[in-house]
Amino acid sequence: MESNLKINKVELRNLRMEDYDQLAGSFKRIYADHDVFWTHAQIKKLITIFPEGQVVIVVDDKIVGCALSIIVDYNMVKGDHTYAKVTGNETFNTHNPNGNILYGIEVFIHPDYRGLRLGRRMYEYRKELCEKLNLKAIMFGGRIPNYHKYADTMRPKEYIEKVRSREIYDPVLTFQLSNDFHVRRVIRNYLPNDEESKHCATLLQWDNIYYQPQTDSYVAVSYTHLTL
């Protein structure tokens, strides 16, 4: 991140369909080595089924970050699962408004704007949303992209411990741990083409300490837009 980058305004807000062209441009910059990006139809569906779960960071009228999520039931994701399974092969038919887990399916910051704690802002929003909707936790599968450098000499468990103790830096896991997430387990083949992570991912979780289990008399919290 260039220290002399001049920024006048930073805004966190819900994603809108008119943002798609800018969003697609950022996707192509970040995932330049991949041929597949989020389609217009996929973004439209996410906004339709769960608008509060989709947010962007806007810096001086430019979209530089995005976080996408759905709601699922804990029983679906507490054990081994894949990204394809939890997203319904990216159809998001797995979204369950009556579930109890806020599940992260995407987060990114444009390379030119990293190091400004913008990602942390989106995670704080997710935590606020989790509490607002009375969900049990935030969960997601996290890559460990530096693991391939150590895979010949250590198992994933040892690698994770060394990242936790700050003996090793991992750009994804180090960030997640610094945001109060903990590793529940290692899941294999979460993203089958993730060679950098050696086909491993960490199942990460942040617990909502204010969560109140639903009872028969529980009235579901409506998707009220948060003030951003």
Model-derived features with residue positions:
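Conserved small/polar residues in nucleotide/adenosyl-binding loops
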Residues: 224-228
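Active-site acidic-Proline motif in GNAT/NAT acetyltransferases
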Residues: 110-112
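C-terminal "cap" of GNAT-fold acetyltransferases
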Residues: 167-182, 189-222
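Conserved acyl-donor/pantetheine-binding loop and adjacent beta-alpha core of acyl/acetyltransferases
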Residues: 67-106, 124, 143-171, 182, ...
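A short beta-loop-alpha structural element at the N-terminal edge
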Residues: 9-23
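Conserved acetyl-CoA-binding loop-helix of GNAT-fold acetyltransferases
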Residues: 115-130
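Helix-loop element at the rim of GNAT/NAT acetyltransferase active sites that forms part
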Residues: 14, 25-38
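Active-site rim helix/loop that mediates acceptor-substrate recognition in acyltransferases
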Residues: 33-59, 63-76, 81-93
